């Protein structure tokens, strides 16, 4: 029994150390690519947190990081396009957890005049949402 415990400990450490992403946080990143004088207003919430309002000038980014929950991780975000903040978009910016727990997953949202574009970083961003 003693040797089995050592064996399991060595295997566990080997797997943990060989996979550098096993404890890396997931991230959601917003970039304001709107016109020069347009401010982006962002508010994201989850079941546990309200991350508050963030105002981004052209070219600025806002990001937050977290670990997936064992049940479900979901961040719902509202975006408004300034200066009058009349144009709005609302969507789920991140969904994960449950049976499949993600480590190091990155959701990039590029906010443009014609809509909100999405990528995980490996491909060109694609238009996902339009302004209402």
UniProtKB/Swiss-Prot annotation:
Keywords: Secreted, Self-incompatibility, Signal
Signal sequence annotation: 1-20
InterPro entries named among the record's database cross-references: Self-incomp_S1 (IPR010264)
GO biological process, one term: rejection of self pollen
Subcellular location: Secreted
CC terms in the record's Gene Ontology section: extracellular region
Record-linked Pfam families: Self-incomp_S1
Keyword Secreted in record: yes
Principal subcellular localization: secreted
Tissue spec: Mostly expressed in seedlings, stems, leaves and floral tissues, and, to a lower extent, in roots.
Family: Belongs to the plant self-incompatibility (S1) protein family.
Listed name of the protein: S-protein homolog 8
Organism for this UniProt entry: Arabidopsis thaliana (Mouse-ear cress)
Gene that specifies this protein: SPH8
